[in-house]
A protein has these predicted regions:
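A short, conserved alpha-helix in the catalytic core of glycosyltransferases
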Residues: 56-61, 66-85
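Hydrophobic pocket-lining residues within nucleotide cofactor-binding pockets
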Residues: 87-89
Length: 126
């Protein structure tokens, strides 16, 4: 399939047949549902690393640490169309993930609130 992309877009990968543990799959599914409910960001799998966008749209977004989780909401706030494409998931070849539930949960909640406030400000100004 070929996407016909117009200006102002973000393409997000959506991992099919994830190669993660049951615990990771469940926690990711819950986090995605909460994020999607709060931000209405049109992205099914924000933890998937595949993100394709135009640099000029990206540079309009205010940078903050861990913003990669919220790129769909931030792009949508700037009137970009969000597309989801299915991608194959692969096991990590080298190294290991340093992320755990404990070191992501509270930071994720705080950032979710920050982005929610940003999107509400954007609605008032836009």
């Amino acid at each position: 399939n070929k996407l016909k992309l117009k200006n102002k877009f973000l393409v997000c990968g959506n991992r099919k047949e994830r190669q993660d543990s049951v615990h990771k799959k469940i926690s990711s599914r819950i986090a995605n549902k909460i994020r999607k409910f709060v931000l209405n960001d049109d992205c099914n799998d924000t933890a998937c690393a595949l993100k394709v966008f135009d640099r000029k749209d990206y540079t309009k977004i205010e940078y903050f640490k861990n913003m990669h989780r919220y790129l769909p909401a931030l792009f949508k706030m700037n009137n970009c169309k969000i597309y989801n494409v299915m991608v194959d998931d692969r096991m990590r070849t080298y190294g290991y993930s340093k992320y755990t539930f404990n070191n992501r949960f509270w930071i994720g909640i705080i950032d979710l609130v920050k982005v929610w406030i940003l999107t509400k400000k954007g609605e008032k100004n836009g």
